[in-house]
Amino acid sequence: MLDHVTPFFALFACILVLFALGWHIRSRNVGTITLSLYLFFGNLDNFVNSVAWWSTAEDKAPGFCEVSIRLRHALYIAIPASNLVIARKLESIASTRQVRASASEHKKSIIIDLLISVGLPVLYVSLMIVNQTNRYGIIEQVGCWPFLSLSWVWVLLVAAPVLIVSFASAVYSVLAFRWFWIRRRQFQAVLASSASTLNKARYIRLLVLTAIDMLLFFPIYVGSVSDTIRGAITTSYVSWSYVHTGFSYIPQFSAEVMEMQPSFKARLILSRLVCPISAYIFFAMFGLGQEARQGYKHAVLKALVFCKLRKERQKPIQNHIVANIEVVTFQSRETSGGIDGSPHSEKFSINTPTKYEEA
């Protein structure tokens, strides 16, 4: 039997990962925004699948499964693609290749980031049908699961893109760290010259995030698919019709059947843990900073006021300052009354208008 703790572990991670999303949206950091959303939907899907198929393998939600398996498949490359966008940005800033850009250049940069972090997963999912042997399958305690034919085409369209994107992200991460280390003494000036919304502390947190992806998740993925690649790369792709024979059939597996396949069970458990662990790391990087804590405090105070458990703080009333201003007027030396003209003052509070007498 698979564990019953992971689904709730995923639900809590799903909530935590949204805490720092507001700051990422304000900073317009495409990589961290898409990574937050992917981790949110990945953990939510994990929780819903596990709860809906807690003790059954019945085909009871075909529409949901169609969406769920595509989301699961997309996440294989979506998370590394978002990390690649983050690593590219960090390397560009630290190498001083990113300077104050015009509006058109900034727009172009955002489009490129979106093509990598969103366009690439969409293309990846659209090619899923080439190797898809069934609409989906159902595994008790796991939920909907994609079933793919293993061949050299699977290596080309499924395994290789993830490895390439992950490797590119690792290269950019190393380069970003190298430039950061070279320019560490004047790095605040480097950030200022790049017109970046990042400060040094946030830059370091992003750098640590990409390093964790490079040192932890990339080796795990390589290790989990290496044996499969060795077996699949020598297997021919017979034909489209052969692969899709019986496409509408929905295979259903009980938890007891999974117990008899330890290698597949290990991959299942690993796949269920990647999103929650990634979300907790993401929260540790961005959900515990000073700006995040201030945001939590503000949100809690707002909630207490809304629930009428705390009075809303009144803004201090500004006291009006009464100024005793004098207006100086001048009289001519030769006046009809023979009065020796000399400057005299009138109180500002007197409503008599100031006049200049004719000479």
Swiss-Prot record:
Annotated GO biological process: pheromone-dependent signal transduction involved in conjugation with cellular fusion
Compartment(s) of residence: Membrane
Membrane topology type: Multi-pass membrane protein
Keyword terms: G-protein coupled receptor, Membrane, Pheromone response, Receptor, Transducer, Transmembrane, Transmembrane helix
Gene3D superfamilies named among the record's database cross-references: Rhodopsin 7-helix transmembrane proteins
Primary residence: membrane
Annotated spans, Disordered: 335-359
Function noted in UniProt: Receptor for the A2 pheromone, a prenylated mating factor.
Name of the protein described by the UniProt record: Pheromone receptor 1
